[in-house]
């Protein structure tokens, strides 16, 4: 029996460039900022990372879907990205954990995708011209119409995308990491207690958090409570936390004034650790400014220099904005730098010890070079709680 021909799909950029390919996943039309990710694997974690809200994600590696989709590697309840762009989907998915194909998962989540285009040419254009607005469609295949829609679509600057992905109520988190990673962490931390009410209590401000973050915190023996990203400092302090974690999330940190206020009021009262958007929000709360990168940092192979130790970490990153060196407040010390473009990749508050990094130490997916940052936070939590690890 012959299979039916693949349905056509088109991707149009605001500069007038149009790419024609085949439909992948759900049919329909979607707009967003066209960006690229250089990871070879980890597409499931990328699909379920809320930080990609409002973005059409292009994978630079040409073959996707070869190990399928499973229910274990999800980083949130569903997908958040605007659309998915690849060169080719593997016709076979083979892995002992695989529960379905990439295209079937995209279809079940209502994600519009495109395959069969020259992703190398697309990425070179984004790299040269910068990330730009685009429209991906299987229903409207008229080039002029699509380009007009791309030009009329909203960008990321000035939009509060966190409101679209953060939880609506608090949650007690109990899930841990897989057994192998737990053994690795506890051996390094010499800490084997889990669930004891005397253990440190971490409140996570969820701006679009990946689930591997609370898994890391929980697997170190902490009690973990997740609150919406718009929670006030008063509400958080009423929970009697021993530390506050500022999560990753999508988009521009500047319009999140509710978060700036809460973080500013928390500084000095409890230990604070932030990553990705949380890094930017901590910096802005201290008086720093941010700016939009030309095409962002997205991938699992970004080199970062630890200025204190001189060591280089290979990190997983996903952000389109960065903290500006110009006008950095005196209270903040730069601790890490991205070796690709020398942008700020980590800061520490000189007076309170609060710290944050622009990358993802939880490594889902990605290298494990930066797990030590969770241990550093744990030391602060234990000291605050009076626990001897």
Curated annotation (Swiss-Prot):
Its EC number is 6.3.5.5. Residues 201-387 form the Glutamine amidotransferase type-1 domain. The active site is at 276 (nucleophile), 360, 362. One of its GO terms (cellular component) is carbamoyl-phosphate synthase complex. Keywords: Amino-acid biosynthesis, Arginine biosynthesis, ATP-binding, Glutamine amidotransferase, Ligase, Nucleotide-binding, Pyrimidine biosynthesis. Coiled coil: none annotated. The keyword Nucleotide-binding applies. SUPFAM superfamilies: Carbamoyl phosphate synthetase, small subunit N-terminal domain (SSF52021), Class I glutamine amidotransferase-like (SSF52317). One of its GO terms (molecular function) is glutaminase activity. Residues 1-197 are annotated as: CPSase. It comes from the Bacteria. GO terms for biological process: 'de novo' pyrimidine nucleobase biosynthetic process; 'de novo' UMP biosynthetic process; glutamine metabolic process; L-arginine biosynthetic process. It catalyses: hydrogencarbonate + L-glutamine + 2 ATP + H2O = carbamoyl phosphate + L-glutamate + 2 ADP + phosphate + 2 H(+). Pathway: Amino-acid biosynthesis; L-arginine biosynthesis; carbamoyl phosphate from bicarbonate: step 1/1; Pyrimidine metabolism; UMP biosynthesis via de novo pathway; (S)-dihydroorotate from bicarbonate: step 1/3. Composed of two chains; the small (or glutamine) chain promotes the hydrolysis of glutamine to ammonia, which is used by the large (or ammonia) chain to synthesize carbamoyl phosphate. Tetramer of heterodimers (alpha,beta)4. Small subunit of the glutamine-dependent carbamoyl phosphate synthetase (CPSase). CPSase catalyzes the formation of carbamoyl phosphate from the ammonia moiety of glutamine, carbonate, and phosphate donated by ATP, constituting the first step of 2 biosynthetic pathways, one leading to arginine and/or urea and the other to pyrimidine nucleotides. The small subunit (glutamine amidotransferase) binds and cleaves glutamine to supply the large subunit with the substrate ammonia. Belongs to the CarA family. This is Carbamoyl phosphate synthase small chain. It comes from Rhodopirellula baltica (strain DSM 10527 / NCIMB 13988 / SH1).
